[in-house]
């Protein structure tokens, strides 16, 4: 997919770079796979802000994407069209099964309209096909990897994402993630062959603040620009630094401080992710 740099007709368009994909469907999405998505603006049921910097943005429907792909084993399908999805960085593909049912799946790299798709242990090792890890050759590049069998894909789902199947040992397989972490997963978990498409997504440039507001992203204010009542870094006469170890608004150390508390799955991590 080519990158398009806009002409500098305004300051906002001077540095804007878009990802252009002429193969995307230009009509409306598949109506029966849409659900209403109500804007929460980062608030919970009490109205309290639980996620900062969210609010506004364009209205859009949620596309029901099939991340499990475990109930159509052995039924051939083909790609009807590729579509834009405002809810994720990757594009999605509408596939039509031989029994007449349509599903949305994440579009794999190189996926084209009319391509044959298959799910199940008997599916060929081809980009876009979904298989149990026990049936995938060691060394294969995979994406949309399950952590628990039947729960649906949780790993390597964003644009350009992928993982590598390193080994199989008994009922577990070792998978190397893009972060460098090597993790054990059950061989009954499923994964999709290939990489996630729209890999140029990371090369786009927003160009102006308003483009982020369209996406529902509000401004991020620095702590040193706040008052002491609002942030531990706030206050001072004139421009000042933090004056202490950098912390979050609630006093938790930041900039590299580890906050992982999920000890239950620590034994599944063979190698921690690499430092950046």
Swiss-Prot record:
Among the GO biological process terms of this entry, one is:
cytoplasmic translation
Q: Where is the composition biased (Basic and acidic residues)?
A: 230-242
The keyword S-adenosyl-L-methionine is annotated on this UniProt entry? no
Q: SUPFAM superfamilies annotated for this entry? A: Nucleic acid-binding proteins, Translation proteins SH3-like domain
- Tell me the segments the record calls region Disordered: 224-258
InterPro entries from the xrefs? NA-bd_OB-fold (IPR012340), Rib_uL2_dom2 (IPR014722), Ribosomal_uL2 (IPR002171), Ribosomal_uL2_bac/org-type (IPR005880), Ribosomal_uL2_C (IPR022669), Ribosomal_uL2_CS (IPR022671), Ribosomal_uL2_dom3 (IPR014726), Ribosomal_uL2_RNA-bd_dom (IPR022666)
User: Which species does the entry assign this protein to?
Assistant: Polynucleobacter necessarius subsp. necessarius (strain STIR1)
Question: Know the name of this protein?
Answer: Large ribosomal subunit protein uL2
Keyword terms, alphabetized: Ribonucleoprotein, Ribosomal protein, RNA-binding, rRNA-binding
The similarity comment for this entry is: Belongs to the universal ribosomal protein uL2 family.
**NCBIfam families with a match to the protein in the record:** rplB_bact
Q: How does it assemble?
A: Part of the 50S ribosomal subunit. Forms a bridge to the 30S subunit in the 70S ribosome.
Ribonucleoprotein listed as a keyword: yes
Its biological purpose: One of the primary rRNA binding proteins. Required for association of the 30S and 50S subunits to form the 70S ribosome, for tRNA binding and peptide bond formation. It has been suggested to have peptidyltransferase activity; this is somewhat controversial. Makes several contacts with the 16S rRNA in the 70S ribosome.
Q: Which GO terms describe its molecular function?
A: rRNA binding; structural constituent of ribosome; transferase activity
Q: Which domain of life is it from?
A: Bacteria
The entry's cellular-component GO terms read: large ribosomal subunit
């Amino acid at each position: 997919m080519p990158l398009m740099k806009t002409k500098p007709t305004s300051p906002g368009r001077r540095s804007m770079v878009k990802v252009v994909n002429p193969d995307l469907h230009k009509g409306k999405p598949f109506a029966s796979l849409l659900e209403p998505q109500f804007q929460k603006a980062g608030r919970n049921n009490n109205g309290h802000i639980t996620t900062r910097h969210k609010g506004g943005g364009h209205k859009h429907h949620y596309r029901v994407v099939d991340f499990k792909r475990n109930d159509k084993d052995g039924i051939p399908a083909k790609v009807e069209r590729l579509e834009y999805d405002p809810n994720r960085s990757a594009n999605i593909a509408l596939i039509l099964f031989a029994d007449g049912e349509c599903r949305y799946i994440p579009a794999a790299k190189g996926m084209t309209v009319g391509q044959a798709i298959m799910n199940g242990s008997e599916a060929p090792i081809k980009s876009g096909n979904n298989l149990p890890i026990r049936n995938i050759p060691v060394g294969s590049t995979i994406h949309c990897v399950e952590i628990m069998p039947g729960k649906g894909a949780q790993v390597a789902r964003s644009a350009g994402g992928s993982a590598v199947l390193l080994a199989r040992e008994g009922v577990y397989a070792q998978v190397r993630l893009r972060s460098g972490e090597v993790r054990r997963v059950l061989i009954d978990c499923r994964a999709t062959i290939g990489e996630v498409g729209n890999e140029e997504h990371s090369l786009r440039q927003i160009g102006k603040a308003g483009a982020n507001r369209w996406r529902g992203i509000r401004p991020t204010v620095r702590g040193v620009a706040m008052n002491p009542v609002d942030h531990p870094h706030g206050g001072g006469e004139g421009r000042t630094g933090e004056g202490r170890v950098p912390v979050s608004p609630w006093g938790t150390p930041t900039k590299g401080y580890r906050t992982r508390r999920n000890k239950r799955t620590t034994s599944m991590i063979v190698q921690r992710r690499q430092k950046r």
